[in-house]
Amino acid sequence: MYPYIKQGINWLLTEQDRNGNMFPEGYGIMEVKGLNAELVDVAVYAQQALDAASKMAVIFKEPLAPKKYAQKAAILKNKINTLFWDDAEGSYCDFYGTIEQAIATTKGAIEQIEMGINAGKYSPEIAKKQEFYKELLKHLATFPEGTEKGWFTNKNWVISTPIESGIATSDKAIRLLDKVRKEHTGEYGPYLSAVERRSMMTIATSVQAMAEAAYGRTDEAMWYVDKIVQTFSRVLPGSISESMPDRGCPVQAWTIYGLASPLVTHVYGITPDSYNKAISISPNLPSGWDNISISDLPVGNNTISFAVKKTGKGTEYNLSSKKADWKYTLTLEGLAGTKYVLNGKTLKANSNEIQLVGKENNLLRID
């Protein structure tokens, strides 16, 4: 797998980056006519690929690759946070490119609307959208030839991917999270396009849940998770539809993303490092939740179970593991300087982190 990953990254940053600015060119996940530029989601996931490759290179003991990939990941992260960010809008842009690309993208949006109208899809809302893009085209015509910057044409949900991935600065993240919730969200989560304000999809709501979780906003993340739960089994028992609440494919593997990932990685706070037989755990219970429990969670060649329960004496944490040779770091905010009971022994915490080993661990954080 690793050799193919290296080939893929090389392809992204050479053949797909003809101007050498580290923003790969081409269509991203959005299926929008004409939106063929340097898109924010592609740039973000390219940055994530570089970061992951730097860690993989360490495992495969390549002497120069870890530093090379890590440096490129850091540069791309900074470029995304500067060149894609529009401070006046308080948002990351749809794409980065030239005024000519912005005009072509807008014309593509108009053509897509006209195709729908010709097919008999006409409504006052569509007419309003058509007028918006025509006015945008007039506005774009005022820019000098060759102007290069970040552009908004659709305000697609992928503007949240820098937050989902955790590479946004905190101030930018909080500002955009609040904006999306207030201005871009419908009944079941973010609109695919905040300009069109029509369709919502499970993937967009999932990304928004993960974005909220990435910046410690547990209750806000669970608000989006609940929107996905509301669509559960609408079309097919035990499944979540692609388009919310009940349209599109009734079964797609990624529709579980917005349920499983926020819960496992944020509420339970489980972060695996399977290669090193290590797991970090930092739970975040939503408001009003007194207990959580997850059983038989596969992690590498191991299986763990983890539970948190608030009691009259304090909060109990129970961790069991199939393997005895794994190591765990349990992080509890505000633990430093307080007493806790670990496997029957009363101790005083020197930090917020507790190291755990073995197959069974029981910890009581004394209130």
Model regions and ranges:
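Active-site core of glycosidic bond-cleaving carbohydrate-active enzymes
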Residues: 2-6, 10, 37-44, 48-59, ...
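Aromatic- and acidic-residue-enriched carbohydrate-binding clefts of CAZyme catalytic domains
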Residues: 24-37
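Non-catalytic C-terminal accessory modules of carbohydrate-active enzymes
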Residues: 211-367
